[in-house]
């Protein structure tokens, strides 16, 4: 019957696959699990995408199946039907289609050869297989892949007679830490932007720009004052060095720190910068002056003694401090300090006094009793000071600073307050150019 129907009994031979397609599986003959149609002598109709009636499930054929030879003679055309419902004369194996996407129409001319199946589903490897012992330089036409695990892929042009896999090629994801050798271009400066050569730059330009700003000057002054305050708080001994200098030079007629430090702090507070030093001067009166006149006399004698001894020049501004006791009311005695500023250069002479500190009558009477009647300086005061009497009679009291024990305010603070007022009056009387 096969001879009468005009169908050749010899099955078509499958030509060897092209050398460019490496991963294509060997074609299956009519003995495969799916039937295959044979050419019909009738006319060839065009293969169009519309010939599919429903999506066809994909059948993945692996390249590990050996070629299978047919042991059954080919069947007549009438007994063979395409499982895909194709209207064309060529039955395409279902393994050739991995998705319902439509392929390109085939030519209406005579076919060049049997239709070959497409490569299996998966990422395009172009002959590359991730397996041990495989040479990674194979299949790259002599080119070195970018990384050992990610070879470079090239899309080959479709060959006639080969049905390509229309599935979208997805990149390999997960499990591979691949570092890309891609380098990015460096930023290039815009040649249209030219720097202003006239504008000052750097730290010096910034300082010149803000030097004339009054607000910045005020902030800098406050910052400087804060830094100086912090330094002097942490180390009070640094104050004379930080604020020393300027046009104000004062000599104190004593080498005792309680007097020199108080006058220095006061003048530096008023003038900002002031050089204050101490020189021991002689009062030439009794150790404990009594009365205002004796106090003023003792302070002035200290100044004159330094000038006579040429310790200071004749126009040197001098500040002298002398403490005395006075009976302001009957049987009510007070300790007072006298401060004198003498500046012969500008003809300035100022006198001021500290606050009065009460002294008990019994302590004054004891100091009087300890002074001999024939004491030669009895006209100016007493031989024994009030501080010495308090030191003998009151425990934990020093003769040099007994004011702290009786008033809570040290003698230095009392002298500082009076010296600050003295410096303020002196500043007002000085010419403006000097200030």
Swiss-Prot record:
| Family to which this protein belongs | Belongs to the PRRC1 family.
Q: What is the lineage of its organism?
A: Eukaryota, Metazoa, Chordata, Craniata, Vertebrata
**Which GO molecular function terms does the record list?**
protein kinase A regulatory subunit binding
Enumerate the residue ranges of region (Disordered).
1-54, 101-165
Q: Which parts of this chain are annotated as the region Required for interaction with PRKAR1A?
A: 296-389
Q: What is its main location?
A: Golgi
What is any one of the record's Gene Ontology cellular component terms? cytoplasm
Name assigned to this protein: Protein PRRC1
Query: What PANTHER family does its record include?
Result: PROTEIN PRRC1
Q: What does this protein do?
A: Acts as a regulator of the protein kinase A (PKA) during embryonic development.
List where Pro residues composition bias occurs: 12-28
Task: Give the GO terms filed under biological process for this record.
Answer: epithelial structure maintenance; somite specification
Task: Kindly state the tissue distribution recorded for this protein.
Answer: Expressed in the brain, heart, testis and ovary.
The gene that this protein is the product of is prrc1
Any phenotype upon disruption? Answer: Knockdown of prrc1 results in small eyes and severe somite defects in embryos.
